[in-house]
């Protein structure tokens, strides 16, 4: 896929808004659970891993890749990034300066984040589930 269009140039930054189960937007899109199958989280996690692995070589040394999903499932968020960094010694989780307040930090602190998610909360506390991780190439 990448080899078909890539010129060999490395990039300073890449945003990977990965395809996901959209489990974090059920509040706004109540049809999401009805359009998903039990195997979707695992299938999409494999696709996310494939995309991460395909894009990582395109990030120049010192560059960054921002990975995000609108999923609340660990396999599409923190577990995905833990697996990726375990398999890529040149990938380092990076603190995200200026991140919105009210975020819940996961392990390691201040590096991987997900917005608190409560679909039954009253406005204005209601918001979508979201995950992001900023990776820097060493």
Predicted segment positions?
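C-terminal catalytic and target-recognition region of SAM-dependent MTase-like enzymes
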Residues: 1-15, 19-21, 27, 42, ...
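Short, functional N-terminal and low-complexity linear motifs
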Residues: 17-23, 48-53
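Glycine-rich S-adenosyl-L-methionine
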Residues: 32-60
